[in-house]
Design a protein with these regions (language model features):
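Helix-coil boundary/capping segments in enzymes
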Residues: 1-6, 100-101, 191
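Active-site beta->alpha loop and helix N-cap motifs at the rims of alpha/beta catalytic domains
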Residues: 1-57, 176, 215
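Short secondary-structure transition/capping segments
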Residues: 2, 27-31, 87-88, 135-138, ...
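Alpha-helix C-cap/termination motif
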Residues: 10, 39-40, 69, 92-96, ...
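Conserved beta-strand edge residues that scaffold enzyme active sites
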Residues: 21-22, 81, 129, 190
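Catalytic alpha/beta core domains of metabolic enzymes, predominantly
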Residues: 50-156, 160-165
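C-terminal alpha-helical cap/extension of soluble enzyme domains
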Residues: 117-120, 127-218
Length: 218
């Protein structure tokens, strides 16, 4: 409560809530979420659906139940796979069974075109070329799905590399340093250091991306 309330006092527009691991059944999960929100009052909140981390499966029906509370304004959709859930939520909204909420994808951006085609409004994730994510969203909004997919496909090898457990952040910081966006790629201990072989592989992918027109490097 103190952390959430402190963030709101400093100007945060809302908070993000995820169910605690170990909860059993929809009623227990929903009760936890609402109790967590009640501790901070009437602030808007984002429901994070990230079962890979929490071990909690949140169904589309549970999202609809949570959305009966007007404080729920967004779903952070990171179920894997979770595309059919997005379609189910948008279908319930169109049928008047729940209010419309915003949906932002995650998971490193690896399903961005598909998430957008299923009704997501955008994405909230980390990737060393965020401008590509914005480009894909703009192209999809303009009805240019093939162009969006082409722009996205150029980056898939690097997206895959960044998603490696343990190494992902080190790879992202290496790319950001190569781009001149940050001065140093080092991670705080106990973060890993990229081997010479891994660094060479990432640099090779960056060179290919640049040669194919997907990025400009200093």
């Amino acid at each position: 409560r103190a952390v959430a309330r402190g963030a709101l006092d400093l100007g945060a527009a809302g908070i993000m809530v995820a169910p605690a691991p170990g909860l059993k059944g929809d009623d227990a999960v929903l009760s936890y979420i609402m109790q967590a929100m009640d501790t901070v009052g009437d602030a808007p909140f984002v429901l994070q659906d990230f079962p890979q981390l929490t071990g909690i499966h949140i169904s589309a029906a549970m999202v609809a139940r949570a959305a009966a509370d007007p404080r729920l304004v967004m779903l952070k959709a990171e179920d894997y796979p979770g595309l059919d859930k997005l379609s189910a939520i948008r279908k319930m909204e169109s049928e008047g069974k729940m209010p419309r909420i915003s949906i932002l994808g995650g998971n490193g951006g690896q399903f961005l075109p598909e998430e957008l085609s299923r009704g997501a409004d955008g994405i909230m994730t980390g990737y060393a070329f965020p401008e590509m994510l914005a480009q894909v969203i703009a192209l999809m909004a303009a009805g240019k799905r093939d162009a969006a997919q082409d722009a996205f496909d150029l980056h898939l090898p690097l997206i895959r590399s960044e998603l490696q457990p343990g190494l992902g952040l080190a790879i992202r910081k290496h790319i950001l340093a190569r781009r001149g966006i940050i001065a140093h790629a080092a991670l705080r201990a106990p973060g890993p250091k990229l081997s010479a072989e891994t660094t060479a592989e990432i640099d090779h992918l960056l060179a290919r991306l640049q040669a194919r027109g997907g990025a400009k490097l200093p």
